[in-house]
Amino acid sequence: MKAFLILEDGTVFEGTSIGSTREVISEIVFNTSMTGYLEVLTDPSYAGQAVTMTYPLIGNYGVCYKDMESQKAWPDGYIVRELSRMASNFRNEDPIQKFLLDNDIPGICGIDTRALTKILREKGTMNGMITTNENYNLDEVLPKIKEYSVKGVVRKVTCSEKYVLPGKGPKVALMDFGAKKNIARSLNNRGCEVTVYPAYTKAEEILATNPDGIMLSNGPGDPKECVEIIEEIKKLYNSNVPIFAICLGHQLMALATGADTHRLKYGHRGANHPVKDLKTGKCYISSQNHGYVVDESTLDSKVAVTAFENVNDKTNEGLEYVGKNIFTVQFHPEACAGPQDTAYLFDRFMDMMKKED
């Protein structure tokens, strides 16, 4: 069946339908990872977006459900050059086409994803429609495509109630703004008892449990939309509990302490982004998935200082908070998918909690 990707600038790509045949309008982004497509599909940070995979062949090792980073797939749509018809992997359980169908994700394959990525790179992230309707009217659909905006996605992806992953070590409160499983797993593997809280939990409820540390997770959308959450993070900041924040959590902590954020032209999404530790001068390859960054020009040096920067575009990749046991990073030290170069940051968080004891 034919499928069409219509961008808000009027560009149309014709290809073949994959997954669900329902029509969808979404924000079109691209990911440069060569592997890890299942982790990408199950990353809650993609809620409200349709993701383009720049690597040309997707699905060649099938689907292994143990590799999922959440309970379901989150992107609105999926765009690939070629979808593998056969999977070669002893861990394979299902073809990716079945996974897309089971999760009701519409997609398109057989288009020039390099050309699409160049458009997004040059013009910036834009909205688009995936449809199987061959009789679409461009004049009618373009206004609808342009009207779309990503809203309310943190409330959509967060857990409905708190739950506990038992452990005999430090007690960590993890605020779930769209947390990938490997954040809790990385803490759990280090012996932590992890209590996962819904995104809109009051700070008083969390602090009443006397946690040894607080983790602010990744998540989707514009951080400035999370007004209620930012107010609670202000209270967490004023406590003496060690805090480690990743991605959206990093942005929310910055907003809670008076800094600002802005949108990137086309975002950082992939498993090959170099970041530099400004204290040691060392560079690491990191996994990233964000469309917003902290604006360094708005930082108060008495509150926070830059700890990491992006080697490619010099944007902020991490902060250390002055006089506080708080550090935050824009990238994903938990990876999945991606390199484990910065997993040591979880050990640093462990050391912070032990010192507090």
Task: Kindly give the residue locations of the regions a language model identified.
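Cysteine-nucleophile active-site neighborhood
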Residues: N218-I285, V293, G338-M353
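Beta-strand-turn-beta hairpins that frame and shape the catalytic cleft
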Residues: G167-V172, T280-C283, Y321-I326
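A glycine-centered loop/beta-turn motif at secondary-structure junctions
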Residues: G318-D357
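RNA-binding accessory domains that recognize and position tRNA/RNA substrates
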Residues: M1-E204, A208-T209, P223, C336, ...
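Catalytic beta-strand/loop cores that center a nucleophilic Ser/Cys/Thr
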Residues: K282-G323, D357
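Proline-centered loop/turn at the N-terminus of a beta-strand
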Residues: P106, K171, P242-F244, D260, ...
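Active-site glycine-centered loops adjacent to acidic/histidine catalytic or metal-binding residues
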Residues: D112, C247, H290, H332
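Short acidic/histidine-rich motifs immediately flanking catalytic phosphotransfer sites
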Residues: A208-L216
